[in-house]
Amino acid sequence: LCQELFPIVQEISKSLKWDLEKNELNCVDIWTVINKKNSFNTSHIHKNSILSCVYYLKIPKDKKGGNLIIKDPRNVWEFFPRPTVLEDCSYNLKSTIGSVNHNPNELVIKPEVGKMIVFPSWLEHKVTQNLSEEKDSDRIALAFNVIENKCQQ
């Protein structure tokens, strides 16, 4: 599945004007995230990678399986108008995801089956509690990181 999703990551990198001739991107650290009823993931970052990706495989039908929250840890947004750094670094994240909540440095992303979210690995992120009341309430996602290798000249 990562091989099928990785071309999307490469397109995002091109849109960010990354030089893919000098820098090769590789998919690493692939894992499955299963959030059962009442489970959640605490705030964290992914060190030693440049992009983090999550692809939604299954969500509860009542859509209460938990949201992905991406937070820019730099508190300058409290004093200045919101720059487009989150949008630019996440392949037009604003139009892909929808509205941003009232906290200008935080995005709330509602999962959808088949949706992939790509964001800079240094951004703090977490998953809110799975509050689904369904019998089959698991929220399942595939996650992976992307690293950069310098190409030999």
Predicted regions and their residues:
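Signature of the catalytic double-stranded beta-helix
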Residues: L1-H46
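Catalytic core of non-heme Fe(II) oxygenases with the double-stranded beta-helix
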Residues: W31-V118, T128, D136-D138, E148-Q152
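Short beta-strand-plus-loop segments that form exposed binding edges in beta-rich domains
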Residues: L131
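An acidic/histidine-cluster motif and surrounding catalytic segment
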Residues: N145
